[in-house]
Regions:
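Juxtamembrane intracellular "pre-TM" segments in multi-pass secondary transporters
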Residues: 1-14, 198-228, 261-262
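Short amphipathic helix-loop junctions that connect adjacent transmembrane helices
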Residues: 33-54, 243-281
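Central cavity-lining transmembrane alpha-helices of secondary-active solute carriers
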Residues: 57-75, 287-300
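C-terminal ends and interior cores of transmembrane alpha-helices
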Residues: 91-105, 318-331
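Intracellular juxtamembrane helix-capping segments at the cytosolic ends
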Residues: 122-136, 349-363
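Glycine-rich segments within core transmembrane alpha-helices of 12-TM secondary carriers
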Residues: 139-166, 180-184, 373-389
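Symmetry-related core transmembrane helices of the 12-TM Major Facilitator Superfamily/SLC fold
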Residues: 171-190, 405-411, 452-471
Length: 482
C-alpha cells in the first residue's frame, strides 16, 4: 500500500488529534525549555531568582508527576470520556501558565508548576490513544510516525519562537503558551468527537485502582524492574537538556559567534532570531535538538534498524554521552551546537528503541501492562535529573555560586541578593570591585573554577547506563530474550 493510499484511510479525527498534539507540544516546550532560566534568572527580568537547588526541586518533582500520573489519568479518561478530560486538561494548563507568573515565592511557584503538570498528565495519554484507535495494522506505522513528527515540530517551533520573544519579557513566553492551549480548547470544544468506547460497569475508584495492580504485576518481574532502574539513569542524563543546558549556555557559552556567522549570510534572519546584544538566546539554541530530530530521525531509524534494540540503545547512549561532553565542555557556540547534533543523534538511536525493547521482553499476554509501566523509568529519571541539576550542578558550574566563592576568597564586600539587590546587581558590583568587565569576569571564573567539568558528571552518568545495560544483557537477561 502506497503512502498516499494510507493517508486516505485516516479519518478526520486522526488529523484533528495530530493538530491538537502539535499545539500542545508548542505550548509545553515553548514554556519548558526556558523554565529553568525563568526559575534562576535575575528578578528584574521578570524571572524568579531562585537557587539551582530550588529549581531542581521544582522541575524534578513536577516533571516526575507528569510521567507518573498518566497511569491514573488514562483510566479516568477511559471512564468519563476523552473530550471532557481534554477540555479539563486545557483549562488546568492555561490557568497554570497564568498562575505561575503571578507568584514570587518558592512554595507558590512550586504549586503552580505541579498544577501545570497535572494538566499535562491528563492530556498525555489521550492523543496517543486516539492515534491507536484511529489506525489499524496497515496504517499504524505511518500514523505513529506522523504523530511523533507533530511532537517534534511543536517541540522545535515552541522554544525557537519563545527564545525570540523572550527579549520582550517572560510574560510573552507564557502568553504564547496560553494562546496555543486556547486554540486547542476551541478545536476540542467544537470539532473533537468522542471515540466509540465500550462502557463498563466498573466504578471509577476501582478503575483508578486497577493501574496500581497492573504496575505491581509488572514490577514483581525483578529483571524488568532492574531494566527500568538502569534506563532511569539514562533519562537523568538526557533530561539535562532541559534542566541545566539552557542555564549553562546563558552563563558560559559565547553564542555571538553563531549570530555573526548567520548574520554574514542571512542578516535579516539573524536579526529576527538574535538578541539585541548580537547573540542567540539559550532557549532558541536548545530548540535545535528537535530540529535535528525532524531532519535526521528517518535516516537514523533506517540505520539502527539493523541492530538489536539493546545494542542500538547502548550505542545511542554512548553517542549521547559524547554530545554531553561537547555541550557542557566548551564555550564556543558552534562547538556547542555541534554537540547538540551529536546529542540528538544519540537520542534518535536510543529513545525509540526503549519502547521497542520493552515490547520485546514483555510476556505476550502482558505487553500493554509493560508498555504502560515503562513510563516509570522516565518519571524516576526526571526526579534524579532534578537532583543532579540542583546541588551537584550548583557546586560545580553555577556561575553565581562560583562568584560568591571568589568574593569570599578575596574578602570583598558585596551586598546579599534580596528584593532590592538582584543577581544582576551582584554580578555588576562584584565585577566592579574586581576591575573586570562582565566578559572578563566570565573568563576568569571559567579558567579558575572550571565549570566545564560538569560534563564529566553528566557523561559519566550516561556511560554508566551503557555499562549497566551491557552487564544486564550478559548476566541478567535470559538468553532467549537477548
Amino acid at each position: 500500500m502506497s503512502a498516499l493510499q494510507v493517508f486516505k484511510k485516516y479519518p478526520r479525527i486522526f488529523w484533528l488529534s495530530n493538530l491538537i498534539e502539535l499545539f500542545e507540544r508548542y505550548a509545553w516546550y515553548g514554556f519548558y525549555m526556558g523554565f529553568g532560566l525563568f526559575l534562576v534568572g535575575s528578578k528584574e527580568t521578570g524571572a524568579m531568582g531562585f537557587s539551582s537547588v530550588e529549581k531542581g526541586t521544582i522541575m524534578g518533582t513536577g516533571s516526575m508527576l507528569l510521567y507518573f500520573l498518566p497511569i491514573l489519568t488514562g483510566a479516568i479518561a477511559d471512564k468519563i470520556g476523552y473530550k471532557k478530560v481534554l477540555l479539563m486538561a486545557f483549562l488546568i494548563y492555561a490557568s497554570g501558565f497564568f498562575m505561575i507568573q503571578q507568584f514570587s515565592s518558592f512554595e507558590m511557584v512550586f504549586i503552580s508548576f505541579i498544577w501545570i503538570c497535572v494538566g499535562g498528565a491528563f492530556f498525555k495519554p489521550i492523543i496517543s490513544a486516539m492515534i491507536s484507535k484511529t489506525t489499524n495494522p496497515e496504517t499504524a506505522s505511518i500514523g505513529f510516525g506522523i504523530f511523533y513528527m507533530m511532537v517534534n515540530i511543536g517541540g522545535f517551533i515552541g522554544p525557537f519562537v519563545a527564545g525570540i520573544v523572550l527579549g520582550k519579557g517572560w510574560n510573552f513566553v507564557f502568553m504564547l503558551s496560553i494562546a496555543a492551549i486556547a486554540i486547542n480548547f476551541l478545536i476540542t470544544l467544537f470539532f473533537f468527537k468522542e471515540p466509540e468506547q465500550k462502557k463498563t460497569p466498573t466504578p471509577l475508584l476501582q478503575s483508578i485502582a486497577q493501574p496500581f495492580k497492573n504496575i505491581f504485576t509488572t514490577l514483581i518481574n525483578w529483571r524488568y524492574t532492574m531494566f527500568l532502574v538502569i534506563m532511569s539513569i539514562f533519562w537523568a542524563a538526557f533530561n539535562q537538556l532541559y534542566y541545566t543546558f539552557p542555564i549553562f549556555v546563558e552563563d558560559w557559552v559565547n553564542t555571538a559567534t553563531i549570530y555573526q556567522g548567520i548574520h554574514s549570510i542571512f542578516p535579516s534572519f539573524a536579526n529576527l532570531i538574535g538578541t539585541p546584544e548580537g547573540t542567540i538566546s539559550a532557549v532558541t539554541l536548545s530548540s535545535m535538538d528537535s530540529f535535528f530530530i525532524i531532519a535526521f530521525q528517518i535516516a537514523v531509524s533506517a540505520f539502527v534498524m539493523r541492530f538489536k534494540p539493546l545494542n542500538a540503545m547502548m550505542g545511542g547512549i554512548f553517542v549521547l554521552s559524547i554530545g554531553l561532553f561537547l555541550m557542557f565542555g566548551v564555550q564556543s557556540g558552534w562547538i556547542v551546537l555541534f554537540g547538540l547534533l551529536i546529542f540528538g543523534l544519540g537520542e534518535m538511536s536510543s529513545s525509540p528503541k526503549f519502547t521497542e525493547y520493552v515490547g520485546n521482553i514483555a510476556p505476550a499476554d502482558k505487553k500493554a501492562l509493560y508498555m504502560g509501566s515503562s513510563f516509570l523509568a522516565i518519571a524516576l529519571g526526571h526526579q534524579i535529573a532534578g537532583f543532579l541539576s540542583g546541588a551537584p550542578y550548583e557546586k560545580v558550574a553555577d556561575k553565581l555560586f562560583l562568584l560568591k566563592a571568589e568574593v569570599l576568597k578575596r574578602g570583598l564586600s558585596v551586598p546579599e541578593i534580596g528584593d532590592n539587590f538582584t543577581k544582576t546587581d551582584y554580578f555588576n558590583e562584584a565585577a566592579r570591585q574586581m576591575n573586570f568587565t562582565q566578559q572578563q569576569l566570565t573568563d576568569f571564573l571559567w579558567n579558575g573554577y572550571h565549570p566545564q567539568s560538569i560534563w564529566i558528571i553528566f557523561s559519566s552518568i550516561a556511560l554508566s547506563a551503557v555499562v549497566l545495560l551491557f552487564l544486564y544483557d550478559r548476566f541478567i537477561l535470559p538468553k532467549k530474550n537477548r
